[in-house]
């Protein structure tokens, strides 16, 4: 099998490529065709999607919203060249946030700075008394000052505008509409 250079980052994408490779081999596809296909794959929308640059900082968006996905995405992001890794995270649903609150703190350890937007409610209403401020508090309990809660996208954008520097990596993450921050 020829050596393959993937265009998508992350160990999880290596496993995906290996599964695709195995399926292709079972189907009798030539190794060179497999290599060409895997090397041409640039990923999918909202999965470590390069959105552009802002004053020399790279903006990337990812749909990750479960702690395991978040940790995998941040692990991939750490291998991406950057000075500081900013994670702009929007928790998805009140029930998920409450149920997985301790895991979010651990999953977000891979970022240098975590900026939190309000929870994306989707189909829910807030009956659990949980907010993104609770996620920030959980992170800051172990890593003081690492996480900051903002009530609006405009506040997050203002913070990024003031503090992000050339060479930084800004990763918007969540299943809701947090990608809009990276587009502004």
PLM features: residue spans?
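ATP-dependent carboxylate-amine ligase
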Residues: 9-12, 19-46, 50-184
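Structural motif
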Residues: 2-6
